[in-house]
């Protein structure tokens, strides 16, 4: 089949971009023709995070309507992974909506909703029109704001006596899959190459990524024990001002200054701003423990781990995840909480950091045990969210 993957918001370089690239790879691996198109009307800071330039096609929606229409109509299945942002010019959104109206009726339109909160959802333009053109819709959680707020606004269950009730379409749950085997084959190191004293956090400068807790854990436990902490992805955005105002000790480096980073004992947290994903994974694969401390509200959690969760387990470090995330997410295989399994993952409890630290000490002092536990974590994450299972599950829904 001919597939067109369209990012109408643009190439952000974060989760939606990663999803689109993983999706493209899976389709090609399974014998389909794929075109990857993205709008260039809005610029983003992380466009170099992933390799895409050799095959992706940029369009300026405000000026290249005919080019965009030809691309999205030259397929059997059109997958829309994002819609324009509220900050784009009027011509961009007008042409995007016009595009929706002129998609060939024969094309099956699939919409993935990657945002969680209603605040983020309302920063999109043309989302309702996109949903109404869709044949298949996916979201992360049955209880999230997309399902429970926006879909109910667009498809109210009660209307006036003079109107017919419009039945809401089904919204299917999805997980963002990753080729976990491929990541392992690229980055996994022998256990003898791992520096057990390096603790490496990855995320962004947004509080739900858990950077304050990582700073706290470093100062109270890791630093006194002579261990080092590196935090990758903390950009100097407006949110970073609060870190400075709180007087949190740190040393900050740009991506080109990484060789200057001080990984000696008894140092403050070492911060790296934007990272190149492949370079980060190489560094992570030689680090004793990798931290992904996202802490979303329970209503947004159903089955989906983030890509950074999966990357930690796939590259060969011991993953450390936020405990309540694991309590609320269900394992794909048996629908039980992730924390109920002997998974090899360390579950970070901000109310009991000492137990987290004791587990880190135990694994650091026994490389054979460490090796067994990271293999366990890899297998668990593979079964939970590998491309071979999850994209197949989604494709079966798309084509049924």
From Swiss-Prot:
GO biological process: DNA modification; symbiont-mediated evasion of host restriction-modification system; symbiont-mediated suppression of host adaptive immune response; symbiont-mediated suppression of host CRISPR-cas system; symbiont-mediated suppression of host innate immune response
One family name in Pfam for this protein: AGT
InterPro entries, per database record: DNA_alpha-glucosyltransferase
Reactions the enzyme catalyzes: Transfers an alpha-D-glucosyl residue from UDP-glucose to a hydroxymethylcytosine residue in DNA
Enzyme Commission number(s) of this protein: 2.4.1.26
Keyword Plastid in annotation: no
Keywords carried by this UniProt record: CRISPR-cas system evasion by virus, Glycosyltransferase, Host-virus interaction, Inhibition of host adaptive immune response by virus, Inhibition of host innate immune response by virus, Restriction-modification system evasion by virus, Transferase, Viral immunoevasion
Pathway terms, separated by semicolons: Genetic information processing; DNA modification
GO terms assigned for molecular function: DNA alpha-glucosyltransferase activity
The keyword Glycosyltransferase belongs to this UniProt entry's keyword annotation: yes
Top-level EC class as recorded in UniProt: transferase
Complex formation: Interacts with clamp protein gp45.
Its biological purpose: Catalyzes the transfer of glucose from uridine diphosphoglucose to 5-hydroxymethyl cytosine of T4 DNA to yield glucosyl 5-hydroxymethyl cytosine (glc-HMC). This DNA process seems to occur immediately after DNA synthesis since the DNA alpha-glucosyltransferase interacts with the clamp protein gp45. The glc-HMC modification protects the phage genome against its own nucleases and the host restriction endonuclease system. The glc-HMC modification also protects against the host CRISPR-Cas9 defense system.
Name the UniProt record assigns to this protein: DNA alpha-glucosyltransferase
Organism: Enterobacteria phage T4
